[in-house]
From Swiss-Prot:
InterPro entries: Thioredoxin, Thioredoxin-like_sf, Thioredoxin_CS, Thioredoxin_domain. This is Thioredoxin. Belongs to the thioredoxin family. GO terms for cellular component: cytoplasm; cytosol. Participates in various redox reactions through the reversible oxidation of its active center dithiol to a disulfide and catalyzes dithiol-disulfide exchange reactions. PANTHER family: GEO12009P1. NCBIfam families: PRK09381.1, thioredoxin. One of its GO terms (molecular function) is protein-disulfide reductase activity. SUPFAM superfamilies: Thioredoxin-like. Disulfide bonds join 33-36. Residues 2-108 form the Thioredoxin domain.
Length: 108
């Protein structure tokens, strides 16, 4: 994983995501999820490309089972963009880099 991506947990979610300055993209994922593995390199690139404009976080749903239901996560990968502690936009499924960039550019 990229040094530009922060692993968050149920315990750190409030501090790392909800209280963050600026927009935060959260990737809800699991080790066994094929599409989650496909999107991982795309997230690494986006984390580098948007450094300073966007914080990118990953939350493993198997290890952190309290947070996903609070935000209605039903399928993975789910990408949620948070601003000022609120969900601004959500995408479910693996996206290409251009699809993810378009999603981010429209919402940050």
């Amino acid at each position: 994983m990229s040094e530009h991506i922060v692993n968050v947990t149920d315990a750190s979610f409030e501090q790392d995501v909800l209280k963050a300055d600026g927009p935060v993209l959260v990737d809800y994922w699991a080790e066994w999820c094929g599409p989650c593995k496909m999107i991982a390199p795309v997230l690494d690139e986006v984390a580098r490309d948007y450094q300073g404009k966007l914080k990118v976080c990953k939350l493993n749903i198997d290890e952190n089972q309290d947070t996903p239901p609070k935000y209605g996560v039903r399928g993975i990968p789910t990408l949620m963009l948070f601003k000022d502690g609120n969900v601004e936009a959500t995408k479910v499924g693996a996206l290409s880099k251009s699809q993810l960039a378009a999603f981010l550019d429209a919402n940050i």
